[in-house]
């Protein structure tokens, strides 16, 4: 900001405060010391305005507000290029400096705790109740918006509290997913196999692989669906539908792990148009130590205490 505009803003601001002080005291000079029956000539629905001074507390509130404004402008930037003299902020307060200061204080306080758990394996951290509580708080802040407060997911977002893992449910895979994120793509097969192929494959997957009944009146050829599946789907999902963690291809034998729904119509929609999903990387936001705690919490969700203790 140029010197001219800085001075203009400062002069206008301070001049306004001075004018308000003058106005308050100038209008107070002619007031009577006590109450009076004299009215100001204003009447509204039978209510008349008397010529009495403001209550003292009201007057002092005006003064206090102006004094607060002056102190604020001394401590914080508000008068053009003036940076303020708030203690603890070299060169004046800014919201960035306040954020950096608070982060630094938090790192100083909690850093040793995170470092202690980072030196342990994810499996070991998952057995520590205090660490799991810390991980749960991190999960609530950073993960619950997609996966839900109970970590059971929703349509398009996987359940983290069951045994179905697209990218692997071991501690290393979970931590890698959180650190680096995951990008998955199910290609659209509608044009390649046609509408009949879509219906046949969907029926085969639901009935033969997942063992779910087909709706009454379903018009589909399971034999042809199996053939098309072997030609186009097995390369990712496996001949038996066991899935492939390296590609994030889900296990088709367990419908409870299908994040886009298991109805015949939803399966057809997935095969016909494909699906795209992305788990954002959290390393730049949380850092390795916090991700380590978070991974331990997620790891503990699908493991009962006995299973965790055996690791």
From Swiss-Prot:
Residues 130-209, 220-302 form the Cytochrome c domain. It is a multi-pass membrane protein. The chain crosses the membrane at residues 4-24, 57-77. GO terms for biological process: oxidative phosphorylation; proton transmembrane transport. InterPro entries: CcoP_N, CcoP_N_sf, Cyt_c-like_dom, Cyt_c-like_dom_sf, Cyt_c_oxidase_cbb3_su3, Cytochrome_c_Oxidase_Subunit. Pathway: Energy metabolism; oxidative phosphorylation. The keyword Heme applies. One of its GO terms (cellular component) is plasma membrane. Its main location: membrane. It is found in: Cell inner membrane. Its cofactor is heme c. Binds 2 heme C groups per subunit. GO terms for molecular function: electron transfer activity; heme binding; metal ion binding; oxidoreductase activity. Heme c 2 binds at residues 186, 233, 236-237. Keywords: Cell inner membrane, Cell membrane, Electron transport, Heme, Hydrogen ion transport, Ion transport, Iron, Membrane, Metal-binding, Oxidoreductase, Repeat, Respiratory chain, Transmembrane, Transmembrane helix, Transport. Belongs to the CcoP / FixP family. C-type cytochrome. Part of the cbb3-type cytochrome c oxidase complex. CcoP subunit is required for transferring electrons from donor cytochrome c via its heme groups to CcoO subunit. From there, electrons are shuttled to the catalytic binuclear center of CcoN subunit where oxygen reduction takes place. The complex also functions as a proton pump. Component of the cbb3-type cytochrome c oxidase at least composed of CcoN, CcoO, CcoQ and CcoP. This is Cbb3-type cytochrome c oxidase subunit CcoP. It comes from Stutzerimonas stutzeri (strain A1501).
């Amino acid at each position: 900001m140029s010197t001219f505009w800085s001075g203009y803003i400062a002069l206008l601001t301070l001049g306004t405060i001075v004018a308000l002080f003058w106005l308050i005291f100038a209008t107070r000079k002619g007031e009577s010391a006590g109450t009076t029956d004299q009215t100001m000539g204003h009447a509204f629905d039978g209510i008349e305005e008397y010529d009495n001074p403001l209550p003292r507390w009201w007057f002092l509130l005006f003064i206090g507000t102006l004094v607060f404004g002056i102190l604020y402008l001394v401590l914080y930037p508000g008068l053009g290029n003036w940076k303020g003299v708030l203690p603890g902020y070299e060169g004046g307060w800014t919201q960035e400096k306040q954020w950096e200061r608070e982060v630094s204080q938090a790192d100083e306080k909690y850093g040793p705790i995170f470092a202690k758990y980072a030196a342990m394996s994810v499996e070991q951290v998952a057995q520590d109740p205090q660490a799991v509580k810390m991980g749960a708080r991190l999960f609530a802040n950073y993960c619950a918006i997609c996966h839900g407060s109970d970590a059971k997911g929703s349509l398009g977002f996987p359940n983290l509290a069951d045994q179905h893992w697209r990218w692997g449910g071991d501690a290393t895979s979970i931590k890698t997913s959180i650190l680096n994120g995951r990008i998955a793509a199910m290609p659209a097969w509608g044009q390649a196999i046609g509408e009949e192929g879509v219906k046949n494959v969907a029926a085969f997957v639901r009935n033969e692989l997942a063992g779910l009944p087909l709706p009454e009146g379903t018009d589909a050829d399971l034999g042809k669906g199996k053939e098309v599946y072997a030609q186009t789907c097995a390369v990712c999902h496996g001949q038996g539908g066991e899935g492939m963690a390296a590609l994030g291809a889900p296990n088709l034998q367990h419908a409870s792990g299908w994040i886009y729904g298991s109805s015949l119509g939803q399966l057809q929609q997935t095969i016909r148009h494909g699906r795209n999903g992305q788990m954002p990387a959290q390393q730049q936001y949380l850092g390795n130590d916090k991700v380590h705690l978070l991974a331990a919490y997620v790891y503990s969700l699908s493991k009962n205490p006995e299973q965790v203790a055996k690791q």
